Amino acid sequence: MLEVIDKGPVGDSQKTPLLFVHGAWHGAWCWDEHFLDFFAAKGYRSVAVSLRGHGQSPAPKPMQFCSMADFVDDVASVADGLPQRPVVIGHSMGGFVVQKYLESHDAPAAVLLASVPPSGIARFLLGRFRLHPWLTARHLAITKSLGSVGRTPELARESFFSDSVPDADVARYAAGLDEEYLGGHVLGMLWLDLPKPALVNAPMLVLGAENDILFSPREVRATASAYHTEAEFIPGMAHDMMLEPGWEAVAQRIHAWLETRCPTASPR
């Protein structure tokens, strides 16, 4: 049973429901900190799922054998349980999952936040080796994980948060981070199962974080270009845009865009 956090109207709301998909190491909790309540207060049914092996969602099989298709199935299973097709909103790896989901599923719109680009994570992995060569190599060799990213508050801040996030918050968020194992889903993002933008028809908002060290402005712009739109960047933000001080600017931009793209819910 997947962990699902569900807030906002559950009846005959005229607004399209929103389905939030977290990134690697994270779970549905990262959306519950601010975004779910924000959008629920705007009248949107706001649903966040923890992908298998993340948050409180169990893994039916060892994560080393988990594929990107498994994550897409997780998103589809939650989306199929909603009364209308949801807008899908993905952060980081969750943005990659959303891109793959949209290849075979309809959605009225999609939002990508600091997303893995269609070209995958090769540059990201090279960056980890440059920044922490021995730590990255040791985790890949011994634990078969990407443990050089967020195993400590110090690494979590370096990877995900700006200096403006209080130490206590970074420690709290770091305590909620999961191990991200080198499974099929990681290989899919590296080269085996890259997105096919030509198969995607949903209108898309692509947002980047100005101070993101994981995915460069060039990669964010390439993502937007692949989906025939323009990238927008939130000033002063690090990678975890939904948890940073100033998260309201991100949420408000998404809300303004949704109000023009999805003013009412569409039937299945």
Language-model regions: role of each:
Residues 23-27, 92, 210:
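Active-site glycine-rich loops that stabilize anionic/oxyanionic intermediates
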Residues 24-36, 218:
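The serine-hydrolase catalytic nucleophile loop
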Residues 38-60:
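Conserved alpha/beta-hydrolase
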Residues 56-86:
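Active-site loop/oxyanion-hole signature of alpha/beta-hydrolase fold enzymes
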Residues 107-143, 185-188:
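Flexible "cap/lid" loop of the alpha/beta hydrolase fold
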Residues 200, 206-208:
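Short beta-strand/loop motif that positions the catalytic acidic residue
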Residues 213-219:
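Conserved alpha/beta-hydrolase "acid-adjacent" motif
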Residues 230-268:
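Catalytic active-site module of serine/aspartate enzymes centered on a nucleophile-bearing elbow/loop
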